[in-house]
């Protein structure tokens, strides 16, 4: 991973220069573009059915998720989509990171770490008990990156999903 090859002081210095902003309605096309680029990287492009209308509805009208952008100067170079979940064991909310994406030409420059630090800061400010996310098991560069930050793989847990037709059938 390129990030590991960087001098730590250089990466930390760069992180202090990274600014963030919350997404606004006008950002819907960019959000969807980043989602599609992430899906391509994850070899899941065919699974993206979201469109601008559904993104606007769920992010801005129903306020079910939040989006922050990492900026280099005034240019969006990466983003995170996240939402609150709840831990009954902790008795408090947490933050679930749905998507973390940095444009390819900006990878290895500290943006991913800066985004996670920003999300950790948001979680602490809001009194959340944890920050969690999923990672594809073949994505070793990301796994190594997360482990380098102190994240722990939840090897005792398996994610289950019911979607589409199966979800509708279960609801009957």
Named regions from a protein language model:
Residues 2-26, 168-172:
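Conserved N-terminal entry element of GNAT/NAT acetyltransferase domains
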Residues 113, 125, 137-156:
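Conserved active-site alpha-helix within GNAT-family acetyltransferase domains
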Residues 22-26, 33-92, 116, 122, ...:
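Acetyl-CoA-dependent GNAT
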Residues 124-134:
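Conserved GNAT acetyl-CoA-binding A-motif
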């Amino acid at each position: 991973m390129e990030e590991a090859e960087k001098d730590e002081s250089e990466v930390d210095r760069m992180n202090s220069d990274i600014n963030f902003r919350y997404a606004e309605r006008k950002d819907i096309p960019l959000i969807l573009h980043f989602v599609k680029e992430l899906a391509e990287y994850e070899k899941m492009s065919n699974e993206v059915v979201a469109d601008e209308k559904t993104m606007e509805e769920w992010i801005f009208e129903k306020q079910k998720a939040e989006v922050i952008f990492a900026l280099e100067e005034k240019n969006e170079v990466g983003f995170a989509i996240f939402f609150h979940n709840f831990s009954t064991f902790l008795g408090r909310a947490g933050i679930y990171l749905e998507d973390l994406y940095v444009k390819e030409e900006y990878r290895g420059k500290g943006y991913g770490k800066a985004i996670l630090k920003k999300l950790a800061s948001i979680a602490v400010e809001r009194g959340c008990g944890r920050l969690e996310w999923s990672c594809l098991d073949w994505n070793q560069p990301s796994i190594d990156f997360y482990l380098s930050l102190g994240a722990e793989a939840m090897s005792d847990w398996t994610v289950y999903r019911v979607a589409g037709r199966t979800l509708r059938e279960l609801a009957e």
